Amino acid sequence: MQKIIVLIGPTGIGKTDLALDLAPKINAEIISGDSMQIYQEVSIGTAKPTDEELKRVKHYLINQRSIFEEYSVKDFVAEGTKAVDKIVADGAIPLVVGGTGFYINALVNQLQLGEPGEYQTSVDPQWEEYLKENGENKLWDLLQAKDPAAAEKIAPQNSRRSLRALTVISRTGKLFSEQQQKINPRYDALILGLNSDREEVYQRINMRVDKMMEHGLLQEAKFVYENRSREHQVIQAIGYKEFFPYFSGEKTLDECVNKLKQASRKYAKRQLTYFKHQLPVVWLDPLQDEKVSEKALRKINEFLNK
């Protein structure tokens, strides 16, 4: 079974920096495991590597699609497996780096995507009524409270899947996420995870948002806002929708920036919940441990040589 390295962690933890440090040392090429970095038109809010960083190490699945093109987890898996094959054929090590847990899990393990009959199953009337009264975001919040791992792989605006998941939970008394198929590995993967003290992670997220604002995030968000009438993949992405009330004159810029920081912190919490429940992770602390790069390199070499 082909060996690959995976580097995951919550937003803002320092995955890109560590990946760029490790890649030359292990002769690796990087596959982005972020569902938003595939899009050409948005770079700041998606925290893409810079042009200089992209030149330092060869990357895959970055800037490959327009936001107006469909791109699903199935597309990601199809293109990700091709990237792995290409990297291996070139004599290098595949290094998957990102924070979209479900996408990475689907690549590493042969998850069943789009289960047959999933949408045909009837849903409990109580959840349909809840949706009518409270809206799709509140419905998703309810799912997130009941089954965080399931919520991680369902977009808030996809009320159909939220209804389905809540129905399965209420009918079976078991978590929807635990009723997915057994793990069937596609690759022999060493999964390294980055995490640290929660308050330090949150502080880094806040600082990162401030830096994004300095680099032009507002202009990027305005592009997304001005194209909101066209159906596209980024309209609900964290980093853009939070500014819509500012552009419509409903909130101040400071209010929207604070909302983005809050949303980013909540997203980091959801990411960690998914990683801890769904993937076998070897955890490292890049904020407290000065030798995190050395430790990661040692674990990688042990894995590749066994």
UniProtKB/Swiss-Prot annotation:
Superkingdom of the organism of origin: Bacteria
Keywords of this entry: ATP-binding, Magnesium, Nucleotide-binding, Transferase, tRNA processing
Residues given in the record as ATP binding sites: G9, P10, T11, G12, I13, G14, K15, T16
One Pfam family here: IPPT
Site feature location: Interaction with substrate tRNA: T100
Subunit structure: Monomer.
Parts forming coiled coils: none
Keyword Cell wall biogenesis/degradation: no
TM stretches of this protein: none
MF (Gene Ontology): ATP binding; tRNA dimethylallyltransferase activity
Cofactor: Mg(2+)
Positions of the UniProt region annotated as Interaction with substrate tRNA: 34-37
An individual GO BP term: tRNA modification
Family: Belongs to the IPP transferase family.
Recorded catalytic activity of this chain's protein: adenosine(37) in tRNA + dimethylallyl diphosphate = N(6)-dimethylallyladenosine(37) in tRNA + diphosphate
Full protein name: tRNA dimethylallyltransferase
Role this protein plays: Catalyzes the transfer of a dimethylallyl group onto the adenine at position 37 in tRNAs that read codons beginning with uridine, leading to the formation of N6-(dimethylallyl)adenosine (i(6)A).
Positions contributing to substrate binding: T11, G12, I13, G14, K15, T16
Enzyme Commission no: 2.5.1.75
